[in-house]
């Protein structure tokens, strides 16, 4: 059998025309320099506003410290009153518990000094309920 001839596609005579491969986008938006300038301006504005807020925050912090310093003697006096009240209640409880022990001196200091020694937590809350000890040690807790 005779092989059939295949006709091959060829370019047109004279070749194909020029192909437009460039993107023709309209020029729009800011130039690179102007975008850089806007970015620097935004950065400077951010630094300026942050500097202003830091100054205001420092002023508020100083005001809080001054208020805390002004209230410190009152808070210390309240704490001292509470401690002395608890020590008095502890002495009364010690007197009732140790009344039958011969030679026991109620309120005798365990320290051999005449100076004031701030009582420890165990000394203050030794005769208290465990809920009160937990509340004094850890503050308010839900699970007790």
UniProtKB/Swiss-Prot annotation:
Gene (UniProt): NDUFA13
GO CC annotation: cytoplasm; mitochondrial inner membrane; mitochondrion; nucleoplasm; respiratory chain complex I
Keywords for this protein: Acetylation, Apoptosis, Electron transport, Membrane, Mitochondrion, Mitochondrion inner membrane, Nucleus, Respiratory chain, Transmembrane, Transmembrane helix, Transport
Family label: Belongs to the complex I NDUFA13 subunit family.
Organism: Bos taurus
Intracellular or extracellular location(s): Mitochondrion inner membrane; Nucleus
GO biological process: apoptotic process; negative regulation of DNA-templated transcription
Gene Ontology molecular function, alphabetical: NADH dehydrogenase (ubiquinone) activity
Annotated TM spans: 30-51
Protein name, as recorded: NADH dehydrogenase [ubiquinone] 1 alpha subcomplex subunit 13
Function: Accessory subunit of the mitochondrial membrane respiratory chain NADH dehydrogenase (Complex I), that is believed not to be involved in catalysis. Complex I functions in the transfer of electrons from NADH to the respiratory chain. The immediate electron acceptor for the enzyme is believed to be ubiquinone. Involved in the interferon/all-trans-retinoic acid (IFN/RA) induced cell death. This apoptotic activity is inhibited by interaction with viral IRF1. Prevents the transactivation of STAT3 target genes.
InterPro entries referenced in this protein's UniProt entry, alphabetically: GRIM-19
Record note on quaternary structure: Complex I is composed of 45 different subunits. Interacts with CARD15, but not with CARD4. Interacts with STAT3, but not with STAT1, STAT2 and STAT5A. Interacts with OLFM4.
Membrane topology category: Single-pass membrane protein
PANTHER family: NADH DEHYDROGENASE [UBIQUINONE] 1 ALPHA SUBCOMPLEX SUBUNIT 13, NADH DEHYDROGENASE UBIQUINONE 1 ALPHA SUBCOMPLEX SUBUNIT 13
Cleaved signal peptide residues: none
Family matches, as Pfam families: GRIM-19 (PF06212)
Residue numbers carrying N-acetylalanine: 2
């Amino acid at each position: 059998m005779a092989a059939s001839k295949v006709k091959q596609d060829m370019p047109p005579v004279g070749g194909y025309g020029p192909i437009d491969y460039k993107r023709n986008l309209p020029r729009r938006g800011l130039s690179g320099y102007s975008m850089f300038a806007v970015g620097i301006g935004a950065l400077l504005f951010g630094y300026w506003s942050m500097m202003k807020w830091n100054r205001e925050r420092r002023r508020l912090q100083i005001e809080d410290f001054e208020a805390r310093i002004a209230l410190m003697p009152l808070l210390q006096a309240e704490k001292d009153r509470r401690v002395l009240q608890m020590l008095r209640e502890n002495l009364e409880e010690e007197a009732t518990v140790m009344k039958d022990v011969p030679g026991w001196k109620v309120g005798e200091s365990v320290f051999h000094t005449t100076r004031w020694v701030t009582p420890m937590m165990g000394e203050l809350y030794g005769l208290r309920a465990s809920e009160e000890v937990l509340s004094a040690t850890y503050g308010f807790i839900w699970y007790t």
